[in-house]
Every structure is written in C-alpha cells, then in structure tokens.
Amino acid sequence: MIRFETQPENYSHWKLAFDGPVATLTLDVAEDKGLAPGYKLKLNSYDLGVDIELHDALNRIRFEHPEVKSVVMTSGKSRMFCSGANIYMLGLSTHAWKVNFCKFTNETRNGIEDSSRYSGLKFLAALNGTTAGGGYEMALACDEIAIVDDRFTTVSLPEVPLLGVLPGTGGLTRIVDKRKVRRDLADVFCTTAEGVRADRAKEWKLVDHVAKPQQFAEFVQKRALDLAQQSDRPGGQGVKLTPLKRELVKVKVDAATRTAEITVHAPEKAPESVDLSADWYPLQLARELDDAILDLRHNHLEVGLWLLKTRGKAEEMLKVDALLEKHASHWLVRETVGLLRRTLARLDVSSRSMFAVFDGESCFAGTLAELAFAADRSYMLDAEPGPSLTLTKANFGSYPMVNGDTRVSAHYCGEVPELPVGSAISARRADELGLVTSAPDDIDFEEEVRIAIEERVSLSPDALTGMEASLRFTGKENMATRVFGRLTAWQNWIFIRPNAVGEHGALKVYGTGSKAKFNWERV
C-alpha cells in the first residue's frame, strides 16, 4: 500500500532549508531507500518515493512558509544534480506502475509552474552537476535554470538513444513550448545521449545562466534574491500541515463491482473567517480530496468507476465560496484555492470513469459542484423534496482545468447558455439546461443508476481511458494538455512495445552490456 502523506522529519531524499525569502530544496537521494525492492537509487536518481517527498516539501513551502518568495532546487551530491528516474526501477516495474509514476511526476512539475503563475512563488534550478533525463525535466519546470561551467557538467535528455523511450515528464514538450529551443536543435539534443555542456546549453536556450564554479554559489544566491523581488507573497505566520484526519472525504471501495464511492462533505457550519489552521474547512477539504484521489489511483487499479457524491447543506457551502471570494487576496486563500485547483485538475486526468450521483442528501453547490462537472456523466434525482445544484462565481474561473478552460465551459463545449448563479437549480430545471445527463424520478432513479454502473464496468478499461481523455478536454490546447494528451499517450504506448520492454528491448537490456535488438518496422 502506497501512502502519499509524509512529514519532513521522515524525508530520506530531500533537505529543506530556509533563509529569509529563499528556500532551498536539496536533492540528496539515499541509494538504499527505494520505495520497492530490487534497485538502488544511484546517481541521485529518483523513484515514486522521492517524488512523494518533493510533493510534500512543495506544500510545506506553500503553506508553512508564506515568507518564502523563491525556491532554489539543487543537489547535495558532488558533480551530479540528478540523473532522472531510476532506470532499473522502470525496468522492474509493471506497465501500470510506470504510467502512474510518470503521471504523478508530471503533476508535481505542473504544480511548480502553477505556483509560479498563480501564487508568486518563483523557482530557480541550480544545476551543480550532471543533469540528465528526469533531472533536466525537473529543472525545466522552474522559472529559470543556472548551470555550473566546470567542463564536466552537462544537460541531456538521453531516453531515446539510450533507453528507447521518451523523456516522459514533459521534457520534449517544454524544450520547444516553454524554452523555445529551435526544433532542429531540439531533435539533435534529444538524440544525443552525452548531452551538451554549459556554453552550448546557453546558446541553444536550454538554460538561462552560466557561472564558473568559484562564482556559482554566489550567483545562485543573488539570482534567487532577484527572483524573490518579483514575488508578491506577503510573509507572516504560516499554517502547520498536521496529519490528515480524513473526515471530510470518505472513500468506500467495492472491489467486487470495481467501483468506489467518493463522498465529499460540506461543513456543518461554514467558517466565518480565514483561520490559520490545517483544520480550516477549505484547506482540509483540498488535502483530503487530493490524498483520496492518489490513494485510489495507485492502490486500487481495478476499481474503474468512481461515484462522486456530496453531503451537507448548500447554504453552508455557499458561505465558504463567499468567504473565499471576499478574501481572495489573502495568502492562505490564494494557496488553498491553488491546492483545490491542482486537486481538481488531478481528477480531470485520472484514468477512471466518473459518475456524479445527486441523491436526496446531495450538496453539489459552488466549489463542490466542480465534482459534478469533472464527472463523465451525472444522474440527478427528480423528487420533492430533492437535490439541487447551485452555481457560484467559483464555477466560472476559480478552478480552471489544465487547458485553462472552466469545467462548465468544457461541459458545454464552449457554448455556455445563460445559467442562474447563487440560486438552487432543481433536477427538472437542471435537465432542461443540460447541466446533468439524466434526471429520473424517484421510481426510476436507483434502477437507472444501477444499470449505468453495470454497463460502464463491463466495458474495456483501455478503450474507456482513451475515450474519456479525448472527451474531457474540449477546445483549446496548451503545453500541459500536450504533455498529457500527446507526450504521455505516446510514452504509454512505447512502454508496452517490444523495442522498449521486450526481451531485447532497450529499457530491459540497459546496464547489462548487451545491445538492444529492435523491430525496425515504423508504426
């Protein structure tokens, strides 16, 4: 069982230090502390356990240290920044493990960029040694990259020539979309296993800054302070992220039917102010929902249908949204909305079918209504008294999907009708407005939902994953959707091809002294 909750005192691979407005995240991987047996994390390589710590450390910076305005990511190893994902771990892993691992690392890198874009937290990658594969992809997520010019240090994306796979954590996409590396040079770079040294890396726009070893530490410190000047994070008292209570988000797994109920609770009484506490309802909700999604993804692979339910009073949930809107400029509100945004985005790209179920006790209001719009279908009981759906301003911009669109807009494929905001919408009216898939009465509701569930879980999980990913994101694309929809999709295909994972595939024979044997047919 994989757990995604951890604390800094339990870290094995990252060191977190603070100096005024600058935090330093130092990667110093413990070779013998991999998450699974059978491999050593040599050369500052990482596995899922390393990235779970990074995910936690980033949230500690966001919530416990509002005084931090810039973050330096560097290495504690001599001449080695990071060699990327551990190759032997990948070779030993199942296809599902590799896919889930890459998705989580992608989301963590996207989260770095999200914090820079929305929260004013700036990131500087300080490459103080060789940087390869996923190590460079981690640097690519930062706002700026500095590299030491010591005649040894290189940057590379060697996956294609060495392993027969892709740099699957955004590397191919970011060098052209974000770094604006010329396409032919990107082609050369991605097929050159040895990579390039500092001067050429700067010339090709692979890095931003170059400094000699004697000046590197001083340069990094100065540049981190300069980046901090660009931030509007206010400082002040932070919020200690205490252990999760798992009170607001309840998960009930039914392995026999391959379904899971995720029930999200509105507060019994909405908070009246912004409380600097991990128990503050919006923050507690975001943390618990994020953990529940990750737990289901990684520990319940055959549970293919998530039933999204809510409980509570809509009026209390509306008060929560009003509080978030009123105090939108407060640092804790901004960070909490950010965590909710990233968590809901995690829901969007989960390879599970999702049905929203509006029964008599439902509370799909405001922020909680986002769950209904994230679902592939929604079933709403038409009864008196019965459930309602209530929209707030939050549904029209607070929680954009990874493509920048709102879920309401995606639901209507960009053609959003005039919708009531702030007032309860009955099942019949929701059906008329096209807000829900179906609104059966109390005689047919349970039967219709049951049949829909049984039908869904009988279909090919592979076909459903591809179908859902294609239908959920309408309209415009951006770098993030190209990472998930193109790079990741191709990587997942390559991960099951014999040229990578067959008996003589490049990923399988890496490090054995044998040469890969390819099927030369282009598909």
Labelled PLM ranges:
Residues 1-69, 75-83, 89, 97-99, ...:
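C-terminal alpha-helix plus adjacent terminal tail
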Residues 76-77, 81, 112-163, 189, ...:
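Glycine-rich beta-to-alpha active-site loop
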Residues 108-109:
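Helix-rich "cap/lid" substructures immediately adjacent to catalytic or cofactor-binding pockets
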Residues 137-138, 174-175, 188, 371, ...:
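Hydrophobic/aromatic ligand-binding patch that stacks against planar heteroaromatic rings
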Residues 146, 208-209, 437-438:
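Conserved phosphoryl-transfer motifs of two-component systems
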Residues 381-398, 402-412, 424-443:
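Catalytic binding pocket for nucleotide-activated donors in carbohydrate/polymer assembly enzymes
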Residues 159, 166-170, 180-183, 194, ...:
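Membrane-embedded alpha-helical core segments of multi-pass
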Residues 170-185, 404-418:
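Hydrophobic, secondary-structure "cap" segments at the distal end of domains
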